[in-house]
Amino acid sequence: MPSTSFPLLETIDDPAQLRQLARAQLKVLAAELRGFVLESVSRTGGHLSSNLGTVELTVALHHVFQTPHDRLVWDVGHQTYAHKILTGRRERMHTLRQQGGISGFPQRGESVYDTFGTAHSSTSISAALGMALAAKRKGESRHTVAIIGDGAMSAGMAFEALNNAGVADCNLLVVLNDNDMSISPPVGALNRYLAQLMSGRFYAAAKNMGKTVLRPMPPLLEFAKRFEQQAKGLVVPATLFEKFGFNYIGPIDGHDLDSLIPTLDNIKGLQGPQFLHVVTKKGQGYKLAEADPVAYHGPARFDPAVGLVKSSTAPRLTFTQVFGQWLCDMAAHDERLVGITPAMREGSGMVEFEQRFPDRYYDVGIAEQHAVTFAAGMACEGAKPVVAIYSTFLQRGYDQLIHDVALQNLPVVFALDRAGLVGADGATHAGAYDIAFLRCIPNMGLACPADERECRQLLSSAYAQNHPVAVRYPRGSGAGVAPLAGLDGLPFGKGEIRRERQRQDSNAPRIAILAFGSLLYPALEAADALDATVVNMRWAKPLDDALLRQVAEGHDALVTLEEGAIMGGAGSAVTETLNAAGILRPVLQLGLADIFIEHGDPAKLLAMQGLNAAGIRAAIAARFPAIDVAR
């Protein structure tokens, strides 16, 4: 638990208590809450900049609205630490993102105040609209609020929801948390006044009455519209959101409770869809995070008095870094290469690429569907697109992957980071399904590198193909096998035998382990005790059919191993291939179970799934009890 004293915050166990506080006390509470968030995250790691930026907004929302009766729907959800603290989870913040602890995102099973589970972006308006209309159908009177960031607002899904919500007859409030701009002091007071004015009942009624009165007089009506637009234009950009049917209010200072609370109070009395634009600053109140919000977006544990400190020892190369180096090297070799990311420059390892090749770098925003089809369009004109995307986010562009890329057999490379389990971010970010959902697509190739060296080589192999290929690799570092300097690839669709069975005279079942990806190394460790053959398959599609037949015919049983969903995964591909060839062998499929695996230490989570060396040995011994397991 944080060691600093937070006397007022320690009296708040639910928002009903917060609603009893006077405005001056709320300001004290916000200051303590910000300090608590900083101290907590410094001890556990987690998302920091975004949470420091939403403290006052969170306090104001819970103060004005009768949560949990009124629904707050957070977009993405990594900015909800203050929300969690104020809704009864303060004493559990020391378990944040740890196995058995509270999630770093909203989860319906964790609290009644978490009205909608989330971690991917741009879902809040759709969910909130559904809740608002469902409440109306039941005759329930409640307010529904979607809180969405400016980055998430760039996604098509958000605009689809706005388009629907603008014509829906319900009381929905969309709060745009804009943390990519600032309010200058001279404008702030006027903003506050106009926001309260525009959110007032008199303004809304007068605006609607004026439209009714002036409708028979088009010239006067047009003049009135232009005057209103010019008046708003003093403090806001041209408001697209009113074209969707929303009453636009703001922008207002998202760190000023004297602006937020009366404005939200006024909005509660309005009918129909409302849109409140608040401006916040990432890292607010912690100078180091304010100066570098990207570095403090998701830090590991650190000392708040010192800030982030680079390790004195050189860390092992990560798969993300391997990709970033390969991308720059291949771009220098082939000017056709273009790099595309849906707002994941840092996470996907594209910072150096952007710096060295700015005219070939495309950040399309949080828009995975667009990213995939954008790449397809570039490929049509002779470019060689490489789409750097997390495995879990490619799910959002699946139709485009099939219809726009694979159906037209376009040479697009998908670099799938965070394949498999991801640790602290939990089930929402796990890349558990890519093998299953990619291998069923015609024309698609899928590579599974075992280590850093193979990652670079298989990226080159994928790039050399004239059809779409994905290369999946896990978060963090691998076995420590240094990549080779060149750009040579490995044979497409071909694996290798990494360990041959040694005891040929044994009567025990002859076992072969077929490893896909980085689990090759625990497979090799397990094989020493089992005297099993180990095959590094490298490709989930196409499978190395010739090698598979050779291994199957020389062994009594096969074990497939993958850090992905068992159902429909690489193991399924093996059994399908053997069945089609008429080769009858028992196949033990090891991988991720048919459950959503929550947050925790990655190594411990893999062990719980039986995907470490000990678990592999135990599973094989249990399935094939006649085998001689060396101890």
Curated annotation (Swiss-Prot):
Pathway: Metabolic intermediate biosynthesis; 1-deoxy-D-xylulose 5-phosphate biosynthesis; 1-deoxy-D-xylulose 5-phosphate from D-glyceraldehyde 3-phosphate and pyruvate: step 1/1. It comes from the Bacteria. PROSITE patterns: TRANSKETOLASE_1, TRANSKETOLASE_2. Coiled coil: none annotated. GO terms for cellular component: cytosol. The keyword Ligase does not apply. Mg(2+) binds at D150, N179. One of its GO terms (molecular function) is magnesium ion binding. SMART domains: Transket_pyr. GO terms for biological process: 1-deoxy-D-xylulose 5-phosphate biosynthetic process; isopentenyl diphosphate biosynthetic process, methylerythritol 4-phosphate pathway; terpenoid biosynthetic process; thiamine biosynthetic process. It is an enzyme of class 2 (transferase). InterPro entries: Dxylulose-5-P_synthase (IPR005477), THDP-binding (IPR029061), Transketo_C/PFOR_II (IPR009014), Transketolase-like_Pyr-bd (IPR005475), Transketolase_BS (IPR020826), Transketolase_C (IPR033248), Transketolase_CS (IPR049557). Its cofactor is Mg(2+); thiamine diphosphate. It holds the Pfam family Transket_pyr. It catalyses: D-glyceraldehyde 3-phosphate + pyruvate + H(+) = 1-deoxy-D-xylulose 5-phosphate + CO2. Binds 1 Mg(2+) ion per subunit. Keywords: Isoprene biosynthesis, Magnesium, Metal-binding, Thiamine biosynthesis, Thiamine pyrophosphate, Transferase. Its EC number is 2.2.1.7. Thiamine diphosphate binds at H78, A119, H120, S121, G151, A152, N179, Y286, E368. Belongs to the transketolase family. DXPS subfamily. Homodimer. Catalyzes the acyloin condensation reaction between C atoms 2 and 3 of pyruvate and glyceraldehyde 3-phosphate to yield 1-deoxy-D-xylulose-5-phosphate (DXP). PANTHER family: 1-D-DEOXYXYLULOSE 5-PHOSPHATE SYNTHASE-RELATED (PTHR43322), 1-DEOXY-D-XYLULOSE-5-PHOSPHATE SYNTHASE, CHLOROPLASTIC (PTHR43322:SF5). This is 1-deoxy-D-xylulose-5-phosphate synthase. It comes from Verminephrobacter eiseniae (strain EF01-2). The lineage of its organism: Bacteria, Pseudomonadati, Pseudomonadota, Betaproteobacteria, Burkholderiales. The gene is dxs.
